[in-house]
């Protein structure tokens, strides 16, 4: 439908005035927005990148990762940092829990010499540091570990037992309003790690909730629920954990998918195991009995040996990773259980309770 010529002139004048006052790009037609193609950073897990639909976590957005204790939350964020650093990006870790282990971070591939780290005294200080780093435009990824440890100044200065109802939620709400726009402008990814609490007196539905009020749930473009589902054993020794991550909220692709992978103690996400499993599923790796073959060449007898081959031959692993990403991610948000490997859809209604945390 054609717009009246007078209206077109009035609209052009209004747009010109807005751009003059607020700067070029302050208003535009949606189809002209070059930022529609979202830049992403890998999570370090191929199946999780596929479940996210966009190939990783979106830059310029807020992400929340929550789960029970020892479920792999910090490990996952350290893998994100390692992936970002490999791309030459600058990363910062706001360690509000004062529990970051640099030796473990180094084992996961993090360049600790170039990782910015802060251990703030108060929640307000932590969030101000986040804002200052974002406004600098020089930091690409910021991790806050964790929301539960962001203690308001009034609570720290008060006595144990004093009531501070709603202080943390109000602090987070103010911070979200301030940070969201700055993150978009700077194209900085901000990841909040969060803990789980139980609602008292819930008879029906999910009694679990996350700390810090509701603001983070609304402002987050992606929310990931990470759970430990089992143990990995070598004989009697536990060497890792089976992990499931559910995409509870996703503003950049289809939500409610989930990914399953292994976290090995001292090594992090077992990416080579994922490559073997997904390669076999999508017929890039041939499996005959116990033998695995790639491009006609045998790479190992048994999954463990096939994984070791990929670990010792990073060029082959990178080639296989590239082929799988091209095959699975180009299907975009229409990924189905048959095409997503370890990633599969969840019933949106079944997960509605999680979304309402």
UniProtKB/Swiss-Prot annotation:
Keywords: ATP-binding, Cytoplasm, DNA damage, DNA recombination, DNA repair, DNA-binding, Nucleotide-binding, SOS response. ATP binds at residues 67-74. The keyword DNA repair applies. Pfam families: RecA, RecA_C. It is found in: Cytoplasm. Can catalyze the hydrolysis of ATP in the presence of single-stranded DNA, the ATP-dependent uptake of single-stranded DNA by duplex DNA, and the ATP-dependent hybridization of homologous single-stranded DNAs. It interacts with LexA causing its activation and leading to its autocatalytic cleavage. This is Protein RecA.
């Amino acid at each position: 439908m054609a717009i009246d010529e007078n209206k077109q002139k009035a609209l052009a004048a209004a747009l010109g005035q807005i751009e003059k006052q607020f700067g070029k790009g302050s208003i535009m037609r949606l189809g002209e927005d070059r930022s529609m193609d979202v830049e992403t950073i890998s999570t370090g897990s191929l199946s999780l990148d596929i479940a996210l639909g966009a190939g990783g976590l979106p830059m310029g957005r807020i992400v929340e990762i929550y789960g029970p204790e020892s479920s792999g939350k910090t490990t996952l964020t350290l893998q994100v940092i390692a992936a970002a650093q490999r791309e030459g990006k600058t990363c910062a870790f706001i360690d509000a829990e004062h529990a970051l282990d640099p030796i473990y971070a180094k084992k996961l591939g993090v360049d600790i010499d170039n990782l910015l780290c802060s251990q703030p005294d108060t929640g307000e200080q932590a969030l101000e540091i986040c804002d200052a780093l974002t406004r600098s435009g020089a930091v690409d990824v910021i991790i806050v570990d964790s929301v539960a440890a962001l203690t308001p100044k009034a609570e720290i200065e008060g006595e144990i037992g004093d009531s501070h109802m709603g202080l943390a939620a109000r602090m987070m709400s103010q911070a979200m309003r301030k940070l969201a726009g700055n993150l978009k402008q700077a194209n900085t990814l901000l990841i909040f790690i969060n803990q789980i609490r139980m609602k008292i007196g819930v008879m029906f539905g999910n009694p679990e909730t996350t700390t810090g009020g509701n603001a983070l749930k609304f402002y987050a473009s992606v929310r990931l629920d990470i759970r430990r589902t089992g143990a990995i054993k070598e004989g009697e020794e536990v060497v890792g954990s089976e992990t499931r991550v559910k995409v509870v909220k996703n503003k950049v692709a289809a939500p409610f998918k989930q990914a399953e992978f292994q976290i090995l103690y001292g090594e992090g996400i077992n990416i080579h195991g994922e490559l073997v499993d997904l390669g076999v599923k999508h017929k890039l790796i041939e499996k005959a009995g116990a033998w695995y073959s790639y491009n006609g060449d045998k790479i190992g007898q048994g999954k463990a040996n096939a994984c070791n081959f990929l670990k010792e031959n990073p060029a082959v692993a990178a080639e296989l990773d590239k082929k799988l990403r091209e095959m699975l991610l180009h299907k975009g948000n229409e990924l189905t259980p048959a095409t997503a490997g370890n990633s599969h859809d969840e019933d949106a209604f079944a997960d509605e309770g999680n979304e309402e945390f």
